Amino acid sequence: MNDIIGSTDFRMQHFTIRELMQRMDDRQLVGKRVQWKLWDEQKQMRFIESVLSGIPIASFYFNGAYPQWTVLDGVERIHAIRRYVYNEIQLRDLELLSREYNGYFSDLLPSVRRRFINTPIMGYVLTTELPKELLNSIFKRLND
């Protein structure tokens, strides 16, 4: 097992929210089958407000050893972004932004929508094929 651990290769990769959404739409990105409970709507709204406020997003981790990537860490954030971009959640009772940001993604000014979907994010992509047990161990380490 130590030999396997030493041979793991996580490659840092920069994305935008738009690129992440495109991977999802193309079914090139999926959540891990056993995930933690997804955030409630209030927590999703706070996260989206943080992104709109320019607060940097924590790194994402992906298993990219196969053409269809699996999210190892960040599925809750990806879920919140997807729901917001597809107008499934509406921002309200904002703490950091003015009332003009209340509402759905489609309600934003085009310049604000562009800025949101072009928000840079950093991901670490595992490029080494690993046994399922080791992937589960990595997942637990990232999420504990």
Predicted regions and their residues:
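Glycine-rich phosphate-binding segment of PLP-dependent enzymes
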Residues: 21-29
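Basic- and aromatic-enriched surface patches that contact anionic nucleotides/nucleic acids
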Residues: 2-13, 17-18, 31-144
